[in-house]
From Swiss-Prot:
The record marks 447, 450 as: Interaction with DNA. It comes from Thermus thermophilus (strain ATCC 27634 / DSM 579 / HB8). This is DNA gyrase subunit B. SUPFAM superfamilies: ATPase domain of HSP90 chaperone/DNA topoisomerase II/histidine kinase (SSF55874), Ribosomal protein S5 domain 2-like (SSF54211), Type II DNA topoisomerase (SSF56719). The gene is gyrB. It catalyses: ATP-dependent breakage, passage and rejoining of double-stranded DNA.
Length: 634
């Protein structure tokens, strides 16, 4: 094929967005789909941050479309002389356009690249924008980025009404049969309500006939307390740090618990920065410096014994760090990591100075926090030997792998799969049925320790936990911690394979709790999966098929009315012979795997605490609330 001018294609307008959507929204799966909603919501939130909007309505419509409406100023509708088009049309049809580029329009905004509105428009089957401004109701419509109805006045605006209403339906040509998930919408609205204290957000779910209002006046301090819900608190009232350095506004809410977990959520201009950035690094550093400085001055620092590290000082801390700044620089369009050095400088200075004041004003709390860090240092030292199990010269060649691990032959972690299997009998079938070239099997005996109730040192004394830590090879902890190293990951797919009954569900929950609390980066990077073993074996004549749910079975039996068939229900993995287990659950060509994803850290943390934590009352409430949805297998 010749490579000349004829081979070069220029993508015009928004065609490039439709051609390569992942460049703009990170992918065309569930996350990318909901990213469209977040982009339009961000625009409405920007109006609130600028002081012009006090209420945002989000409506999930019966046809699957979504409406976002604010009571701000309304997108400008006058002509742009250089474009010869109304401003609202330019914003929705041109990349890198919008008020965010004009210094006076928005002091702070989350819409960094000026592509949000136009990208949503390009990736939607249709979009309708209505503007209420200067007493008039304006409307313009689009389809897949092209204008289908030019801007026109469709009537008078209700008296005093201003703002923008955007309704859009993501394009099935891009996203297939995906739909909006109300829980994801709810989670983001709740997040925004905490981050913009006093902003009223209303969610109308027309598909399920529900309406919810999110409004919080406590801001990030309330957010931190919600994050720690269900934990035993070291003190009741969360602290709030607020300050400005240069053009950067800093807000931090924090609270200490008696538990072993730490949770720090970070935001820049209301955008969740899942991968942290300069503000997170500066917060951790300033927090540690202030605590150490106070401890030294107050004589709390004992020279004997292990000294607290940064991780020890953070143990039990629940914090929310929010910065607002002009011209934020993020890594990638999906805004996962903040890069601005001035954000780090501001957070470092504001947090260090104000935290020292808080510690000096609250000596009893300061002493309790530092003594907890000293205990964490002692526990870390006690766990050091256990951690040595997972330090390897070569992650794929080690004499310290657990004896019951049936390892695979490949030395390429990207090809390797680890099946964590419930019970020795199922483990035996899995070992015989697997493809030993790339599949490893680790059978677990009985139920593993509930790490939500146990500390790290106790967890590392548990044989099943130690076997998993040793086999997986990354250590324990989070990104950037000395004892956690993703480079050591021996298997890029870690597959939890348990029975489809109540006991299996419990073991699966215990394992997920372990991964969430002590190996969360594996979940965040998509390495943890749940196998879906079949519930039924259906034989019609000589033909055998496997069914994975009661609904699937009922639908199939309806088709077979009047015919002779045999149905076998699998109560556990051990009932399947090695060939059946391979064919139904392990064969990459035929199996069904569910990837474990972490969309909302606050919701996940609360759920694990409710299900697996010390407090009985929240667990009882959860069970009573969800009992009507349960399927009993008695």
């Amino acid at each position: 094929m010749s490579y000349d001018a004829s081979a070069i294609r220029v993508l015009k307008g928004l065609e490039g967005v439709r051609h390569r959507p992942a460049m703009y929204i990170g992918g065309t799966g569930v996350e990318g789909y909901h990213h469209l909603f977040k982009e339009i919501l961000d625009n409405a939130v920007d109006e609130a941050l600028a002081g012009y909007a006090t209420e945002i309505l989000v409506r999930l419509n019966e046809d699957g479309s979504l409406t976002v409406e604010d009571n701000g100023r309304g997108i400008p509708v006058d002509l742009m002389p250089e474009e010869g088009k109304p401003a609202v049309e330019v914003i929705y049809t041109t990349l890198h356009s919008g008020g965010k580029f004009e210094q006076g329009a928005y002091k702070v905004s989350g819409g960094l690249h000026g592509v949000g509105a136009s990208v949503v428009n390009a990736l939607s089957e249709w979009t309708v924008v209505e503007v209420f401004r200067e007493g008039k109701h304006h409307r313009i419509a689009f389809s897949r980025g092209e204008v289908t109805e030019p801007l026109r006045v469709v009537g008078e605006a209700p008296r005093g009404k201003t703002g923008t209403r955007v309704t859009f339906k993501p394009d099935p040509e891009i996203f297939g049969n995906l739909r909006f998930d109300p829980s994801k919408i709810r989670a983001r609205l709740r997040e925004v309500a905490y981050l913009v204290a006093g902003l009223k957000l209303v969610f109308q779910d027309r598909q399920h006939g529900k309406e919810e209002v999110f409004l919080d006046k406590g801001g990030v301090a309330s957010f931190a307390k919600a994050l720690a819900e269900g934990e035993d608190l070291l003190y009741e009232k969360p602290f709030l740090i607020r300050g400005t350095h240069g053009e950067v506004e800093v807000e931090v809410g924090f609270l200490h618990t008696q538990g072993y977990n730490a949770e720090i959520l970070t935001y820049a201009n209301m955008i969740p920065t899942r991968d942290g950035g300069t503000h997170l690094t500066a917060f951790k550093s300033a927090y540690s410096r202030a605590l150490n400085q106070y401890a030294k001055k107050a004589g709390l620092n004992k020279e004997k014994g292990p000294q607290p590290t940064g991780d020890d000082l953070l143990e039990g801390l629940y914090a929310v760090v929010s910065v607002k700044l002009p011209n934020p620089q993020f890594e990638g369009q999906t805004k996962g990591k903040l890069l601005n050095p001035e954000a780090g400088t501001a957070v470092g200075q504001v947090v260090y100075e104000r935290l020292l004041e808080i510690l000096e004003e609250n000596p009893r709390i300061a002493k309790a926090v530092y003594e907890k860090a000293l205990r964490a240092a002692q526990a870390r030292e006690a766990a050091r030997k256990a951690r040595e199990l997972v330090r390897r010269q070569n992650p794929l060649e080690s004499d310290e792998l657990p004896g019951k691990l049936a390892d695979c032959q490949t030395e390429n972690p990207e090809e390797a799969e680890l099946f964590i299997v419930e019970g020795d009998s199922a483990g035996g079938s899995a070992k015989q049925g697997r493809d030993r070239r790339f599949q490893a099997i680790l059978p677990l005996r009985g139920k593993i320790l509930n790490v939500e109730k146990a500390g790290l040192s106790k967890a590392l004394k548990n044989a099943e936990v130690r076997a998993m830590v040793s086999a997986i090879g990354v250590g324990i902890g989070g990104d950037g911690e000395a004892h956690f190293d993703l480079e050591g990951l021996r298997y890029h797919k870690i597959i939890i394979m348990t029975d489809a009954d109540v006991d299996g569900s419990h073991i699966r929950t215990l394992l997920l709790t372990f991964f969430y609390r002590y190996m969360r980066p594996l979940i965040e990077r998509g390495h943890v999966y749940i196998a879906q073993p079949p519930l039924y074996r259906l034989q019609v004549g000589k033909k055998v098929e496997y069914l994975y749910s009661d609904e699937e079975l009922q639908a199939r039996l309806k088709e077979l009315e009047g015919k002779h068939y045999e149905v076998q229900r699998f109560k556990g993995l051990g009932e399947m012979n090695p060939e059946q287990l391979w064919e139904t659950t392990m064969n990459p060509e035929k199996r069904v795997l569910k990837r474990v994803e972490l969309q909302d850290a606050l919701e996940a943390s609360e759920l694990f605490e409710k299900l697996m934590g010390q407090e009985v009352a929240p667990r009882r409430e959860f069970i009573e609330e969800h009992a009507r949805y349960a399927e009993l297998d008695i």
